[in-house]
C-alpha cells in the first residue's frame, strides 16, 4: 500500500507541475493564486505531501478545471 500511496502522490504532483508550467506560472505565482504557500506547492509537485481534499479543490479552481482532470 505504501508504494501505491507514494506513486499516486508523484503522479498527482507531476500533473500539477505540468499544468502550472503550461500556464507559464512560477510556483510562487501559482501558490498565491491558490491561497497556498510556495513550499507547500513544491512539496506537492515532488510527491512529498499527502494533499488535503480542500487543497485539491483550490488547485482545480485555480486551473479552472474539474478535480477529475488532475488525475
Describe every region a protein language model picked out:
Residues 3, 46, 65:
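Short, conserved catalytic or interaction motifs in soluble domains
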Residues 36-51:
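Recognition helix of helix-turn-helix/homeodomain-like DNA-binding domains
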Residues 10, 21-22, 50:
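Short amphipathic helical patch at the helix-1/turn junction of helix-turn-helix
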Residues 14-33, 63:
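Short basic helix-loop element that most often maps to the first helix and adjoining turn
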Residues 1-11:
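A detector for short, charged/polar N-terminal pre-domain segments
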Residues 55-69:
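DNA major-groove recognition helix of helix-turn-helix/homeodomain DNA-binding modules
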Residues 16, 30-31, 41-44, 70:
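Conserved hydrophobic/aromatic packing and binding residues within compact polymer-binding modules
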Residues 16, 27, 38, 53-56:
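Helix-turn-helix DNA-binding elements, focusing on the entry/boundary residues of the two helices
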Amino acid at each position: 500500500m505504501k508504494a501505491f500511496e507514494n506513486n499516486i502522490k508523484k503522479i498527482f504532483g507531476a500533473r500539477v507541475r505540468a499544468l502550472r508550467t503550461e500556464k507559464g506560472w512560477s510556483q510562487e505565482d501559482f501558490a498565491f493564486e491558490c491561497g497556498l504557500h510556495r513550499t507547500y506547492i513544491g512539496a506537492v509537485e515532488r510527491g512529498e505531501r499527502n494533499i488535503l481534499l480542500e487543497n485539491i479543490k483550490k488547485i482545480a479552481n485555480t486551473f479552472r478545471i474539474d478535480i477529475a482532470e488532475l488525475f
